[in-house]
Curated annotation (Swiss-Prot):
GO CC annotations, alphabetized: cytoplasm; Holliday junction helicase complex; Holliday junction resolvase complex
Record text about domains: Has three domains with a flexible linker between the domains II and III and assumes an 'L' shape. Domain III is highly mobile and contacts RuvB.
Organism field: Salinibacter ruber (strain DSM 13855 / M31)
Localization per record: Cytoplasm
Keyword Nucleotide-binding: no
Keyword presence, Lipid metabolism: no
Gene name as annotated: ruvA
Family as reported in the entry's similarity comment: Belongs to the RuvA family.
Region (Domain II): 65-143
The protein, known as: Holliday junction branch migration complex subunit RuvA
One Pfam family, short name: HHH_5
Keywords: Cytoplasm, DNA damage, DNA recombination, DNA repair, DNA-binding
Chain segments carrying region Domain I: 1-64
């Protein structure tokens, strides 16, 4: 199994990326959310991958975060939901939004995904609700090259601190996202916790 690819970004389109890894070129299918975070060509990039292997299909799918990959893999485990539909879902909404819509049974939102009708939405709600309930889907929306490690570490530490202070994981994630939308440069977990607590009380 290919768990990730890390190398030089040679080419990118809205649904794929070509990554050179020591002279080997890997064509990786990506959702729109990952495409938007890809660096310029000739820069280094790392993608978390899922190797889809069937008798009539062998493809590599790449994601900016492990959460996206987990959601993709979980969705492809649903009856009659293939990688194309799972990729379409992650192109239409974030892992957090997808999880929330499934947990809330929001069929009107789910049917906005290309290829998802009412019956498929019902199936997604029934089969994904338990699987996604405890999924940590806090997103890192920073670019996929350079400078994101400190920010990602601060988010993870802040999430842990906020849940220890009594917030639910969903509320903590929501507060952190709200803070980072208004203060994208924060890289201190302490500052993030302080502002997130304030946001949660407003």
């Amino acid at each position: 199994m290919i768990d990730y690819v890390s190398g030089t970004l040679v080419d990118k389109t809205t649904d794929s990326a070509l990554v050179d890894v020591n002279g080997l070129g890997y064509r990786v299918h990506v959702p729109t959310s990952t495409y938007k975070r890809l660096p310029d060509t000739d820069e280094e990039v790392t993608l978390h991958t899922y190797h889809y292997l069937r008798e009539d299909d062998e493809s590599l799918y790449g994601f900016a975060t492990k959460a996206e990959r987990t959601v993709f893999e979980t969705m492809t485990g649903v009856s009659r939901v293939g990688p194309k539909l799972a990729l379409s879902a992650l192109s239409a909404m974030t892992p957090t939004e997808l999880r929330d819509h499934v947990m809330e049974g929001d069929k009107s939102r789910l049917t906005q995904i290309s290829g998802v009708g009412t019956k498929t939405a019902d199936r997604l709600i029934v089969e994904l609700r338990d699987r996604l309930a405890d999924l940590d889907v806090l997103e890192d929306t920073s670019p996929l090259s350079g400078g994101s490690d400190a920010r990602a570490e601060a988010r993870a530490d802040a999430l842990e601190a906020l849940t220890e202070l009594g917030l639910s994981k969903a509320d903590a994630e929501r507060s952190i996202r709200q803070v980072l939308r208004d203060n994208a440069g924060i890289q201190s977990a302490d500052e993030l916790v302080r502002r997130a607590l304030k946001a949660d009380q407003e």
